[in-house]
Regions:
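N-terminal export signals and maturation junctions of secreted/periplasmic proteins
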Residues: 1-14
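Solvent-exposed, polar/charged alpha-helical surfaces in well-ordered, non-transmembrane soluble domains
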Residues: 13-17, 30, 89, 93
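Short, functionally critical alpha-helical segments immediately adjacent to catalytic or ligand/cofactor-binding
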Residues: 24-40
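Structural motif
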Residues: 23-24, 81
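Non-catalytic cell-wall polysaccharide-engagement segments
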Residues: 59-164
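Cell-wall polysaccharide-cleaving catalytic domain and substrate-binding groove, primarily
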Residues: 15, 35-67, 151, 161
Length: 164
């Protein structure tokens, strides 16, 4: 699955171990990293040099739309993510603490849209972020010939398609 992404492939064990330590799905972590780093091609995946040292940020934590490389690298520096391993573990810790460990923001959809408090505490600004991430995850599961087990479906008042 990552054979054509050597930047991530050489850190497969780090993703697996970070996932285990933070009780996060490893397929999700890798998919999230692929999405946020443009399939591991961005500067944040390959290290951004600040003051003679490289910093990494695989999940786009702290990366603002105004200058995602600069702000993402500054966040990585502030948190000591000066190796890919530290960035993988640190990012997984951030995602777990600030999103997945909260019942109201533990899905891709709720991370992006925050239905309980729309417009506040959202992981991403891209309106297709949750869908794009879900598609990458679905492709991984399809290639592994398995299916996800747990789904949370949000149903809105005027959503005839999903009404019971």
């Amino acid at each position: 699955m990552l054979f054509d992404r050597p930047v991530l492939l050489k850190h497969t064990d780090d993703f697996i171990n970070a996932a285990k330590s933070k009780h996060v799905n490893e397929v999700y972590l890798i998919s999230h990293a692929l999405l946020e780093t443009g399939a591991a091609k961005s500067e944040l995946a390959n290290g951004v040099e600040i003051d003679g040292k490289k910093y990494y940020n695989f999940y786009g934590v702290g990366a603002l739309d105004s200058d995602p490389i600069k702000t993402g690298a500054e966040y990585a520096k502030k948190h000591g993510w000066d190796t890919p391993q530290k960035a993988i573990y640190g990012g997984a810790d951030f995602i777990h603490k600030h999103f997945l460990s909260h019942d109201d923001q533990n899905t891709l959809y709720s991370m992006r849209w925050n239905p309980k408090n729309p417009g506040e505490h959202q992981y991403a600004t891209d309106i297709k972020w949750a869908e794009s991430n879900a598609n990458i995850i679905a492709d991984f599961y399809k290639n592994m010939k398995t299916e996800g087990k747990y789904f949370k479906l949000y149903v809105y008042k005027d959503d005839d398609k999903h009404q019971k």
